[in-house]
A protein has these predicted regions:
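GIY-YIG nuclease catalytic motif and its immediate N-terminal context
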Residues: 1-51, 55, 91-96
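Conserved short loop/helix modules at catalytic or binding sites
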Residues: 53-99
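Short arginine-rich
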Residues: 59, 101-108
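Coupling/hinge elements of helicase-like and P-loop NTPase modules
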Residues: 105-118
């Protein structure tokens, strides 16, 4: 049995924070690497990773290339939130992102990972 606590395990996400998905909230976001997700009452809409969480949040607002995500955040169901988990390195963030996409299968992630391809 693993001695990892839920905080150390990617199986049990414990987020470092969340904000409403609005640009004025950007100043509260960290500038370090991490994994993030965008969520409303439908569930997890998108999972991403970033070397700078704050900059990536702002990029989603300025120039969203994912047309489905763009449409869903324009017309959210209930409270639209941005959650993040700090990661020590970008490599760790990528690993967590791939795993979460496989497990949670968000509807707007274009890349889907399975056990054979990581």
């Amino acid at each position: 049995r693993s001695s990892a606590t839920p905080r150390d395990s990617i199986d049990y996400p414990v987020f470092d924070g969340s904000v409403q998905y609005k640009t004025p909230r950007a100043f509260t976001l960290p500038t370090n690497p991490g994994v993030y997700l965008i969520h409303d009452f439908r569930g997890i809409l998108y999972i991403g990773e970033a070397k700078n969480i704050r900059n990536r949040f702002l990029q989603h607002h300025r120039n969203e290339e994912n047309t489905l995500l763009k449409e869903l955040v324009k017309y959210p169901f209930g409270d639209l939130r941005f959650y993040w988990l700090n990661a020590e390195t970008k490599l760790k963030a990528v690993k967590i992102q791939k795993y979460w996409i496989r497990v949670f299968q968000p509807i707007t992630n274009n890349i889907k990972y399975n056990k054979d391809r990581s």
